Amino acid sequence: MEKYQKKIIDNTHFSDLLRLELLIKYGGTWIDASVLVTKYNEIFFKKDLFFFRTVNDTEIAGSNWFITSEKENPVLKTTRDLLYEYWRKEKYLCHYFIFHLLFNYAYNKYISDYLQMPNFSNIPVHYMQKQLTYRFNSTLFTYILNEASIHKLTNTIFIYKFYYLIK
């Protein structure tokens, strides 16, 4: 908490710790506020561990803006412990995706859990986000809704790009 109050840990990376603590203690699903769910699909909510997987990236296993887990999930506990150890020792953020890199290490440690998880790419869930700065196209919108029922709408990089466009 001290490093967060001193602004050494920013809001984004503090929320990584918060999401892990809540999921480890209570289980359930963490959904960032920037996510739109257009259709309920039980497979995303009723698993011991679920997150959208990253395609063609050996360093980042998947996204952390939507995670379902059981209580005391070992992958999340390992990720949390590694993050606390990192922040105990460090005064600066070495990589924006530190959560994802440590998450990748943790899931490799428990690879059998990862292999049992439903395989959903994080690419289709970003389609809508990429269209937000363009003129509305109903055909494309229908296509996107058919491709995914969960949509990640914003991220920090997108917000800065959008701000630049409207300036």
Predicted regions and their residues:
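Small-residue hinge/turn detector
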Residues: 17-28
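Glycosyltransferase-associated regions of secretory-pathway enzymes
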Residues: 1-16, 33-167
